[in-house]
Each structure stands twice: as structure tokens, then as C-alpha cells.
Amino acid sequence: MSQILEMCAEQLYQSEQKLKPIAPIRSELGEDATVDDAYVIQDINTERALNSGRRLVGRKIGLTSVAVQKQLGVDSPDFGMLFADMAYGDGEAIPPGKLIQPKVEAEIA
């Protein structure tokens, strides 16, 4: 399985580098894939980013709504890494050429 995880990490890395979307990797992971497998893939690419000089500045928490968790068949929030080159200040323009499929999500408190 570790070879498959490495291959999936490489596909995601190349997608980010080339700013080109790829098909979901879940079919390559197989039905036995776990959330832990997904975090291994994330760890591989986090290590790669840190080794290339990117600076980790925080984390992005997702799936915080129980309703959304149920919709997606999970039972807890997930998280991803936020690097300095991904963070923008209030009112700062975000260059669209740096994003693969830009979207906006409202966070209502």
C-alpha cells in the first residue's frame, strides 16, 4: 500500500505544481483505503513542501458541521496544512492564476 500512497502523493503534487486538475485518487487507493492513508499522503506532500522551503503557518479545518460529516460518511472534522504562500490578508487580492478551481465558501458564525 505504501507504494500506492507514494504514487497518489506524487499525482497530487504534480497537479498542484502544474495547476491542472486530476481525477479523484480514491479509485487508485481502493475500497480498503482509510482516513489514515489520506493523512499519510498529506504527510508525504507536507514533507516535500517543507523540504522545498515552504513555511507552514497553520491548518485548515474542514467538515466541522455534523450534517456535512454525515453527508460524506465521516464522523470527525478533517484538516490540511496552510503554508505561507497560501495565506492572504483581509482585502488582499488573490491571483486567480495560482488556483486550480477557485471557489468561495462562506463561514457564518
Q: Where are the regions a protein language model picked out?
A:
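Active-site microenvironments in enzyme catalytic cores
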Residues: 2-109
